[in-house]
Amino acid sequence: MTLLKMYRHLDHFDSPGHFHHRELIHEKRNFKKRAFTVGIGGPVGTGKTAWLMQICKALRDKMNIAVVTNDIFTSEDAEFLIRNEALSKDRIIGVETGGCPHAAIREDVSQNMYALEELMKRFPDVELLFVESGGDNLAAHFSKELVDYSVYVIDVSGGDKIPRKGGPGITQADLLVINKIDLAHLVNADLSVMERDSKKMRGDGPFLFARAKDCFGIDEIINHILTAREKALEAKPVYSLRKE
């Protein structure tokens, strides 16, 4: 069976969905074949790549990690990570989707699966993989065939209406990150409104306010990711967030 046939499906969403109805990790998931994989998605310009860089820098000396980025016709995000020395060049693969970023993380994930398999060949002992989606709309959401845990990044520059506009990314991501909170006063965005609406849209699904430029919120983000990994692997933690 080809990867195209294995990882191709079409979904139509009748509603934004609910946090407790989100896809869960597949029962037959083999973490020895592919390490625990985290998806980072969100609209264009919300700070996905900036956060991925900060996360990589925080974890790279403590864990064996690697990254796949998605762009439509360039490898801009991969080049950004390499230029800023988030990881060594061989640990970063840029995928050019050639079309809708949404499709590459859900409807047909084969390009990203190829890239992840290549990273596993290069680094058989890798512990944590990341897939950053290309910037897309609020309907974009990762397939659980591709990732085990999803982080959806929005920012305040789109206005405080964004959380209540919904979309599967906002309602069903494992973690919602509201970035660039320092810009709220410039665009008249009310953080209390965003907090209220995030709770309404996500129920008790976790969300947090963050600021990538100075790493505000990074400990919480990493804790959510590593806790999910530990739970999925049913293993005791073998690392800490901070160097001793």
Curated annotation (Swiss-Prot):
Matching InterPro entries: CobW/HypB/UreG_nucleotide-bd, P-loop_NTPase, UreG
Gene Ontology CC annotation, any one: cytoplasm
Entry's Gene Ontology BP terms: urea catabolic process
Keyword Nucleotide-binding: yes
GO molecular-function terms, A-Z: GTP binding; GTPase activity; nickel cation binding
Purpose: Facilitates the functional incorporation of the urease nickel metallocenter. This process requires GTP hydrolysis, probably effectuated by UreG.
Protein name: Urease accessory protein UreG
Name of the gene this protein is made from: ureG
